[in-house]
Every structure is written in C-alpha cells, then in structure tokens.
Amino acid sequence: MTLSVSARHRLGTFELDASFTSEGGVTALFGRSGSGKTSMIRIIAGLLRPDEGQISLDGEVLADSGKRLFLPAHKRRFGYVFQEARLFPHLSVAQNLRYGRWFTTGKDTNANDDRIIDMLGISHLLQRRPNRLSGGEKQRVAIGRALLSSPRLLLMDEPLASLDEQRKAEIIPYLERLRDETKIPIVYVSHSIQEVARLADRVVVMKDGKVEAEGKAAEVLSRPDFSTYLERREAGSILSGNIESFDERHGLAAVRLNAALLQVPAKKATAGTPARVLIPARDVMLALVKPEGLSALNILEGHVTGISESEDGMVTIQMDCGGDIIQSRITDLSRERLHLEPGKPVHAIIKSAALDPY
C-alpha cells in the first residue's frame, strides 16, 4: 500500500502546506496542537477539500485540484475513528457494529466479524447501550465499527485524547493487536510521544502546517533534535536498542543500546527483539563523579554536547553517552553550580525509563 499526500489549504490565518508518503503499517502524524495534523487527516478522508494538491492510494487518484477531481468521502472506503466514539446512543453495541457493515460490499464475513470482536475484547458488551460503557470501551467499539466496514485505510484522529491515563493504558494493547493482526494501513494522529513511540512504524512530524521531519519511527524518534517538537513535560530521549534478557522475578528487561546496558521495567519482554526506550528529561539527574549507594539502576557516563535555555529558569542538557544521546532538564542554578559546558564529562543518573518493544 502506498499513500501519497500533497495538500495546500488556508483556514483563516492558518496555512497548511504539507506532503508525505506512507508505505503501509502505522504512519503517525505527530505534532503539537495546532500543527495541522487534524486538517491533514480530514483532507485524506475527503471531509475537507484542499485548495490545492493531490492524494492517491496505490495509484488511484482520490483528489487532484489541477484536474478538478475530488472523490467524496463515502466513496473512498476509509474507516475513521474520531476523538470521541460517536456511537449511536439508541443502538446496542452489536447494532452499532453492524452499522459498519452497511458500507461494505461482498460476501458474508461472520468469521471476520467474530475475529475483530474478539481482538478488541468487546464480545461481552454486545447487548449494552453506549451509556453503559466506559470511555475506553466506547472507543474500542468505535474502532470495531470502522474495521467492520472493511476499510482500505484506517484513519485515527487522536483516538485516546479524551481518555484518562488509566483508560489509555487499557486500550493501547488493543491498538497494538489491531496493528499486528489486521495489517490494515493506519494513519494515526497524536500529540502524545508515548502513543507514537509504541504504535508507529513511520512518523511524520508537523509544525505550523508544514512537515518538519519524516521517516521510519526508530530513526525519527531517535534524532537528537526531536525533543524540540515535544511539550516540555514530554521532552526527553527516545533510544533504539535490543533486549538482551528479561528478569521475570523483578520485572526488568536488559536493553542494549550503543554502549550502555539499561535495566528497564517491563511486564514481559523477549530476548533478541528490538525495543525503544523512553527516558524523560525531567527524570535524569547529573553528577560530576559516579555516585554510589543510590536506588537508581542506570548510571551512564558521557559528556555534555549542548545546552538549551528556556524562559522558566530551566535548561536542557544534552549528553553523548557512548553514542546514545541523553537529555536532562535541570535548573539553571544547577547548571551554574556544576559548571556545565559542552565537552564536560558527566554521569547521567536515570531515575525512570519506559520500554516499548516493537
């Protein structure tokens, strides 16, 4: 599957001028609020007609402003999952799911329906009405309805944005199964680095209506300058490595990076598989000498490569630890007391890290 998108569109004072391609799997449109992600996915869906541009899927032209061609949304055979579930309140879950079948043609596919229902873990909800579902359950039903329409492409616009952290944690594993088992190409809009790092095969970074970076997720997310696109609270390092071993008793995975071996909390992990490690900058302390007697499991030796200041009295210190780029967010006073400057040797004390196998 090859999706090619090029669009220019003005909305008030905001101008979208962006292009990208997707070769299947999960392509994440990532960026801060107002970067143009939702406008782009609405253009792909056919819900917004661009002023200029062209969209094609596997060689089929869906929109071409030069030829005045625009295929309506209902003829594109795309599934769409919104921020809110948008279920019909007067219908049961089973009836909401069957609604998706109205948009597909072909033979009866009860076996496929059952597979999707099982994959999303909603078989026990079929007779309930939406008002008796949790937020996470509603979104799983909405995803099921979109899948039952047999879409050529699944569009997901911030599907977890309206959920609290507990509900997000509940639904993420189902999205992983969706990615791995259905093989339906997905365009996934999000401003959450945790979601993107866990789900995406390819990342398109958007800012002010333009594409700033594009490529394989492992490559884009590991770039030293990627943190500039993150909210301050999410700033940090995303490193690629391989799982060497898993300590089931202590729930720790040993992840080999370029030079370091990190111990990272994990419920399960398989030795020999690739993984990404998320290290929040706010959870990295710095020391000039290697400390002893700490509870922190990971202490990396490196040197300062860059310092970025912000208006809130905080600075971001970038370090090279054996080829792995680590970031730490500390106060400007701490920077002064440690006399930190590019080239200075330091030890990075990692208080927490998250593992995302892929």
Curated annotation (Swiss-Prot):
Its EC number is 7.3.2.5. SMART domains: AAA. ATP binds at G31, R32, S33, G34, S35, G36, K37, T38. It comes from the Bacteria. InterPro entries: AAA+_ATPase, ABC_transporter-like_ATP-bd, ABC_transporter-like_CS, Mo/tungstate-bd_C_term_dom, ModC_ABC_ATP-bd, Molybdenum_import_ModC, Mop_domain, P-loop_NTPase. It is found in: Cell inner membrane. Keywords: ATP-binding, Cell inner membrane, Cell membrane, Membrane, Molybdenum, Nucleotide-binding, Translocase, Transport. It comes from Agrobacterium fabrum (strain C58 / ATCC 33970). Part of the ABC transporter complex ModABC involved in molybdenum import. Responsible for energy coupling to the transport system. It is a peripheral membrane protein. This is Molybdenum import ATP-binding protein ModC. It catalyses: molybdate(out) + ATP + H2O = molybdate(in) + ADP + phosphate + H(+). Residues 1-233 form the ABC transporter domain. GO terms for cellular component: plasma membrane. PANTHER family: ABC TRANSPORTER I FAMILY MEMBER 10. The gene is modC. The complex is composed of two ATP-binding proteins (ModC), two transmembrane proteins (ModB) and a solute-binding protein (ModA). The lineage of its organism: Bacteria, Pseudomonadati, Pseudomonadota, Alphaproteobacteria, Hyphomicrobiales. GO terms for molecular function: ABC-type molybdate transporter activity; ATP binding; ATP hydrolysis activity. Belongs to the ABC transporter superfamily. Molybdate importer (TC 3.A.1.8) family. Residues 293-358 form the Mop domain.
